[in-house]
């Protein structure tokens, strides 16, 4: 669901005045100003006031906010559970009881001007696949991969088979040293690419998390070797862009958390610090 003109729904905690809008100036009082009764687009308080208003309304309907993920709300009644996810003015509602979902939609429709976009299929660059017969749901960023590959002119590159070369030794001493190297790296979108890859890591591609983490350490002064490592990640993503996360039909397996960890003693060549890492899924 989408909230129409969401920022106009926020209440203001302070007095704010604005000049009369062009085309609507009072001819009898042209020097007077307008006092805002609600938030409008362009105010620095707009997004915050809208979020506060939505939070108040949805909690009034019985939803509880997740402490770890403030954009996630939950409402439970017996065995019926409803989840609501908010991203600015976009809303996803899910649950195991259709009438409960409809009641949430009806309530929100009374509070705000809403647009029902139907079953969620694509949100925040993530494609949602469903196989109801097998009780499977998949999350894919295929389109996002194509977008960043084209943006950084890697859409026709060779295909990679691993995100990072085995035993690749990246360190700060490999950063740009000479004026020529510095000028060369200024024209390389290193930080932008690393950030774009990080979004994929956060959403659907944990398989490139280690490579992204390693290359992100050299954003201040990257060198040619660092840039090559980043491009290798893009080549791997090009080859595996159709891979996606799948959540299956086995409740016991889905609710079980597996954790792995490892550590290395003084293995950072730059400062001889020890490193540790973990993954939970």
Task: Spell out what each predicted region is.
Residues 1-281:
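Long, low-complexity, charge-biased intrinsically disordered regions
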């Amino acid at each position: 669901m989408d909230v129409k003109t969401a920022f106009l729904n926020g209440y203001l905690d302070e007095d704010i005045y604005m000049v009369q809008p062009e085309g609507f100036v009072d001819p009898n009082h042209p020097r007077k100003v307008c006092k805002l009764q609600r938030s409008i687009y362009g105010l620095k308080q707009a997004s915050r006031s809208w979020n506060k208003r939505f939070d108040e309304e949805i909690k009034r309907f019985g939803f509880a906010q997740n402490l770890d993920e403030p954009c996630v709300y939950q409402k439970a009644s017996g065995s019926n559970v409803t989840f609501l996810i908010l991203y600015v003015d976009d809303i996803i509602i899910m649950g195991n009881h259709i009438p409960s979902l409809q009641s949430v939609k009806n309530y929100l429709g009374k509070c705000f001007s809403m647009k029902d976009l139907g079953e969620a299929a694509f949100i925040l660059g993530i494609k949602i696949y469903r196989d109801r017969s097998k009780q499977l749901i998949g999350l894919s960023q295929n389109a996002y991969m194509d977008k960043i590959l084209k943006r950084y002119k890697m859409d026709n590159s060779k295909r990679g088979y691993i995100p990072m070369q085995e035993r690749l030794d990246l360190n700060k001493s490999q950063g740009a040293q000479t004026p020529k190297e510095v000028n060369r790296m200024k024209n390389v979108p290193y930080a932008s690419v690393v950030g774009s890859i990080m979004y994929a890591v956060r959403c659907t591609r944990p398989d490139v998390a280690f490579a992204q983490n390693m290359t992100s350490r050299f954003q201040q002064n990257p060198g040619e070797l660092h840039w090559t490592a980043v491009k290798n990640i893009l080549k791997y993503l090009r080859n595996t862009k159709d891979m996606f996360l799948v959540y299956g039909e086995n409740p016991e397996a889905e609710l079980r958390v597996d954790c792995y960890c490892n550590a290395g003693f003084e293995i950072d060549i730059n400062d001889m610090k020890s490193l540790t890492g973990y993954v939970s899924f």
